[in-house]
A protein has these predicted regions:
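Conserved glycine-rich cofactor-binding loop
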Residues: 11-12
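Amphipathic alpha-helical dimer-interface segment in Rossmann-like NAD(P)H-dependent oxidoreductases
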Residues: 110-130
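Rossmann-fold cofactor-recognition segment
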Residues: 48-64
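Catalytic loop of short-chain dehydrogenase/reductase
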Residues: 107, 127-128, 133-172, 179
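Conserved glycine-rich Rossmann-like NAD(P)H-binding loop of the short-chain dehydrogenase/reductase
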Residues: 26-41
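C-terminal helical subdomain
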Residues: 165-231
Length: 231
Protein backbone atom coordinates (compact mmCIF):
# COMPACT_ATOMS: atom_id res chain seq x y z
CA UNK A 1 0.00 0.00 0.00
CA UNK A 2 1.34 3.46 -0.87
CA UNK A 3 2.21 6.09 1.68
CA UNK A 4 -0.65 8.37 2.62
CA UNK A 5 -0.83 12.13 2.81
CA UNK A 6 -3.36 13.42 5.33
CA UNK A 7 -4.82 16.77 4.29
CA UNK A 8 -6.60 18.57 7.12
CA UNK A 9 -8.79 21.48 6.07
CA UNK A 10 -9.71 20.22 2.62
CA UNK A 11 -11.45 22.56 0.21
CA UNK A 12 -11.06 24.32 -3.12
CA UNK A 13 -7.73 25.92 -3.93
CA UNK A 14 -4.56 24.97 -2.11
CA UNK A 15 -5.55 21.66 -0.57
CA UNK A 16 -7.11 20.40 -3.79
CA UNK A 17 -3.92 21.25 -5.68
CA UNK A 18 -1.77 19.57 -3.01
CA UNK A 19 -3.96 16.46 -3.12
CA UNK A 20 -3.57 16.26 -6.89
CA UNK A 21 0.18 16.95 -6.79
CA UNK A 22 1.01 14.34 -4.18
CA UNK A 23 -1.54 11.91 -5.57
CA UNK A 24 0.14 12.14 -8.97
CA UNK A 25 3.39 11.16 -7.23
CA UNK A 26 1.87 7.94 -5.93
CA UNK A 27 0.49 8.98 -2.56
CA UNK A 28 -2.91 7.84 -1.40
CA UNK A 29 -4.84 10.84 -0.11
CA UNK A 30 -6.93 11.22 3.04
CA UNK A 31 -9.13 14.31 3.15
CA UNK A 32 -10.33 15.75 6.46
CA UNK A 33 -12.84 18.59 6.72
CA UNK A 34 -16.17 19.43 8.34
CA UNK A 35 -18.26 19.45 5.17
CA UNK A 36 -19.29 15.97 4.09
CA UNK A 37 -20.50 17.27 0.72
CA UNK A 38 -17.12 18.87 0.04
CA UNK A 39 -15.33 15.69 1.08
CA UNK A 40 -17.48 13.49 -1.13
CA UNK A 41 -16.92 15.72 -4.15
CA UNK A 42 -13.19 15.85 -3.45
CA UNK A 43 -12.82 12.08 -3.26
CA UNK A 44 -14.79 11.59 -6.47
CA UNK A 45 -12.64 14.15 -8.31
CA UNK A 46 -9.40 12.54 -7.14
CA UNK A 47 -10.56 9.04 -8.01
CA UNK A 48 -11.46 10.29 -11.49
CA UNK A 49 -7.77 11.18 -11.85
CA UNK A 50 -6.71 7.70 -10.79
CA UNK A 51 -5.74 8.73 -7.25
CA UNK A 52 -6.61 6.55 -4.26
CA UNK A 53 -8.57 8.76 -1.86
CA UNK A 54 -10.77 8.58 1.21
CA UNK A 55 -12.53 11.17 3.35
CA UNK A 56 -13.15 11.66 7.05
CA UNK A 57 -15.34 14.31 8.61
CA UNK A 58 -13.80 16.13 11.60
CA UNK A 59 -13.53 19.62 13.04
CA UNK A 60 -9.93 20.88 13.12
CA UNK A 61 -10.70 22.64 16.42
CA UNK A 62 -11.42 19.31 18.10
CA UNK A 63 -8.23 17.39 18.96
CA UNK A 64 -10.09 14.16 19.69
CA UNK A 65 -11.91 14.32 16.37
CA UNK A 66 -8.68 14.97 14.47
CA UNK A 67 -6.92 12.10 16.21
CA UNK A 68 -9.85 9.81 15.44
CA UNK A 69 -9.90 10.78 11.76
CA UNK A 70 -6.16 10.18 11.43
CA UNK A 71 -6.53 6.77 13.06
CA UNK A 72 -9.26 5.84 10.58
CA UNK A 73 -7.12 7.03 7.68
CA UNK A 74 -4.19 4.95 8.90
CA UNK A 75 -6.37 1.85 9.17
CA UNK A 76 -7.76 2.33 5.67
CA UNK A 77 -4.82 3.75 3.71
CA UNK A 78 -1.76 2.53 5.58
CA UNK A 79 1.34 4.33 6.81
CA UNK A 80 1.09 8.09 7.03
CA UNK A 81 3.95 9.73 5.19
CA UNK A 82 2.85 13.37 5.22
CA UNK A 83 0.55 15.63 7.20
CA UNK A 84 -0.59 18.72 5.29
CA UNK A 85 -2.19 21.20 7.69
CA UNK A 86 -4.37 23.53 5.63
CA UNK A 87 -7.07 24.18 8.23
CA UNK A 88 -7.97 27.81 8.87
CA UNK A 89 -10.46 29.18 11.38
CA UNK A 90 -10.85 32.64 9.86
CA UNK A 91 -11.37 34.25 13.27
CA UNK A 92 -10.53 37.90 12.68
CA UNK A 93 -11.70 39.07 16.14
CA UNK A 94 -11.96 42.64 14.85
CA UNK A 95 -10.43 45.22 17.18
CA UNK A 96 -8.33 43.36 19.74
CA UNK A 97 -8.67 46.21 22.21
CA UNK A 98 -12.44 45.73 22.18
CA UNK A 99 -12.34 41.92 22.30
CA UNK A 100 -13.06 39.84 25.38
CA UNK A 101 -9.55 38.79 26.51
CA UNK A 102 -10.92 35.40 27.53
CA UNK A 103 -11.95 34.73 23.93
CA UNK A 104 -8.64 35.61 22.29
CA UNK A 105 -7.12 32.21 23.00
CA UNK A 106 -9.67 30.58 20.71
CA UNK A 107 -7.76 31.86 17.66
CA UNK A 108 -5.13 29.22 18.44
CA UNK A 109 -7.57 26.28 18.51
CA UNK A 110 -6.92 25.41 14.86
CA UNK A 111 -3.52 26.98 14.20
CA UNK A 112 -1.77 25.53 17.24
CA UNK A 113 -3.87 23.02 19.18
CA UNK A 114 -5.28 21.24 16.15
CA UNK A 115 -1.98 21.17 14.28
CA UNK A 116 -0.06 19.87 17.28
CA UNK A 117 -2.69 17.19 17.90
CA UNK A 118 -2.38 15.97 14.31
CA UNK A 119 1.41 15.81 14.50
CA UNK A 120 1.33 13.94 17.80
CA UNK A 121 -1.14 11.38 16.46
CA UNK A 122 0.81 10.74 13.24
CA UNK A 123 4.30 11.03 14.73
CA UNK A 124 5.12 7.33 14.99
CA UNK A 125 4.25 6.87 11.30
CA UNK A 126 6.19 9.96 10.27
CA UNK A 127 9.29 8.74 12.11
CA UNK A 128 9.06 5.29 10.55
CA UNK A 129 8.67 6.72 7.06
CA UNK A 130 11.99 7.30 5.25
CA UNK A 131 10.76 10.76 4.27
CA UNK A 132 8.08 11.72 6.77
CA UNK A 133 6.97 15.34 6.68
CA UNK A 134 4.63 17.94 8.13
CA UNK A 135 3.66 20.65 5.65
CA UNK A 136 1.77 23.74 6.79
CA UNK A 137 -0.16 26.37 4.87
CA UNK A 138 0.29 29.84 6.35
CA UNK A 139 -0.61 33.42 5.50
CA UNK A 140 1.33 36.67 5.34
CA UNK A 141 -0.75 38.39 8.03
CA UNK A 142 1.55 36.61 10.49
CA UNK A 143 4.64 38.44 9.22
CA UNK A 144 6.53 40.51 11.79
CA UNK A 145 6.28 43.61 9.64
CA UNK A 146 4.75 46.99 10.56
CA UNK A 147 3.17 47.39 7.13
CA UNK A 148 1.54 43.95 7.34
CA UNK A 149 0.35 44.79 10.86
CA UNK A 150 -1.38 47.84 9.42
CA UNK A 151 -3.03 45.74 6.71
CA UNK A 152 -4.26 43.24 9.31
CA UNK A 153 -5.80 46.00 11.42
CA UNK A 154 -7.48 47.57 8.39
CA UNK A 155 -8.88 44.18 7.39
CA UNK A 156 -10.13 43.48 10.94
CA UNK A 157 -7.95 40.37 10.86
CA UNK A 158 -5.94 40.83 14.03
CA UNK A 159 -6.92 37.38 15.30
CA UNK A 160 -5.80 35.78 12.05
CA UNK A 161 -2.50 37.65 12.31
CA UNK A 162 -1.92 36.31 15.82
CA UNK A 163 -2.75 32.76 14.75
CA UNK A 164 -0.50 32.91 11.70
CA UNK A 165 2.45 34.30 13.66
CA UNK A 166 2.10 31.59 16.29
CA UNK A 167 1.77 28.92 13.62
CA UNK A 168 5.00 30.07 11.98
CA UNK A 169 6.77 29.76 15.32
CA UNK A 170 5.34 26.29 15.89
CA UNK A 171 6.63 25.24 12.46
CA UNK A 172 10.11 26.39 13.44
CA UNK A 173 10.00 24.62 16.78
CA UNK A 174 8.74 21.37 15.27
CA UNK A 175 11.34 21.56 12.49
CA UNK A 176 14.14 21.93 15.03
CA UNK A 177 12.71 19.25 17.31
CA UNK A 178 12.15 16.62 14.60
CA UNK A 179 15.03 17.23 12.20
CA UNK A 180 17.32 14.69 13.84
CA UNK A 181 14.50 12.14 13.86
CA UNK A 182 14.13 12.27 10.09
CA UNK A 183 10.87 14.21 9.94
CA UNK A 184 10.86 17.36 7.81
CA UNK A 185 8.61 20.26 8.86
CA UNK A 186 8.01 23.21 6.56
CA UNK A 187 5.51 25.85 5.57
CA UNK A 188 4.44 27.80 2.52
CA UNK A 189 3.30 31.35 3.29
CA UNK A 190 0.75 32.78 0.89
CA UNK A 191 1.17 36.51 0.38
CA UNK A 192 -1.88 37.15 -1.75
CA UNK A 193 -5.25 35.74 -2.79
CA UNK A 194 -5.47 32.24 -4.21
CA UNK A 195 -7.23 32.49 -7.54
CA UNK A 196 -10.80 31.26 -7.39
CA UNK A 197 -11.10 31.25 -3.60
CA UNK A 198 -12.20 34.84 -2.99
CA UNK A 199 -12.67 38.25 -4.55
CA UNK A 200 -9.60 39.78 -6.14
CA UNK A 201 -8.47 43.07 -4.57
CA UNK A 202 -6.57 45.77 -6.48
CA UNK A 203 -2.93 45.80 -5.43
CA UNK A 204 -3.04 42.35 -3.82
CA UNK A 205 -1.18 39.59 -5.71
CA UNK A 206 -3.26 36.75 -7.13
CA UNK A 207 -1.52 33.39 -6.83
CA UNK A 208 -2.22 30.03 -8.40
CA UNK A 209 -3.02 27.03 -6.22
CA UNK A 210 -0.85 24.85 -8.46
CA UNK A 211 2.17 27.07 -7.76
CA UNK A 212 1.61 26.65 -4.03
CA UNK A 213 1.30 22.87 -4.39
CA UNK A 214 4.53 22.82 -6.40
CA UNK A 215 6.22 24.82 -3.61
CA UNK A 216 5.08 22.25 -1.05
CA UNK A 217 6.40 19.43 -3.22
CA UNK A 218 9.70 21.25 -3.60
CA UNK A 219 10.08 21.66 0.16
CA UNK A 220 9.18 18.02 0.70
CA UNK A 221 11.74 16.75 -1.79
CA UNK A 222 14.59 19.13 -0.91
CA UNK A 223 14.17 18.82 2.87
CA UNK A 224 16.43 21.81 3.42
CA UNK A 225 14.87 25.25 3.78
CA UNK A 226 11.74 25.04 5.91
CA UNK A 227 9.94 28.07 4.49
CA UNK A 228 8.77 29.12 1.05
CA UNK A 229 6.70 32.13 0.03
CA UNK A 230 4.29 32.60 -2.84
CA UNK A 231 2.98 36.02 -3.82
Amino acid sequence: MSKAIIIVGFGPGVSTAVAERFGAEGFSVALIARSQARLTAGVEALKAKGITAAAYSADARDPAAIRGAINKARAELGQIGVIHWNAYSGQGLGDLLAADPASVGSVFDVAIVGLLSAVQEALSDLKESPDGAVLVTNGAFGDLNPMIDGFAIAAKAEGIALANAAKAKLVGLLAARLKDEGVFVGEVTIAGIVRGTGPEIPGVPVVEAKSIADAFWGLYKARGQIRARIG
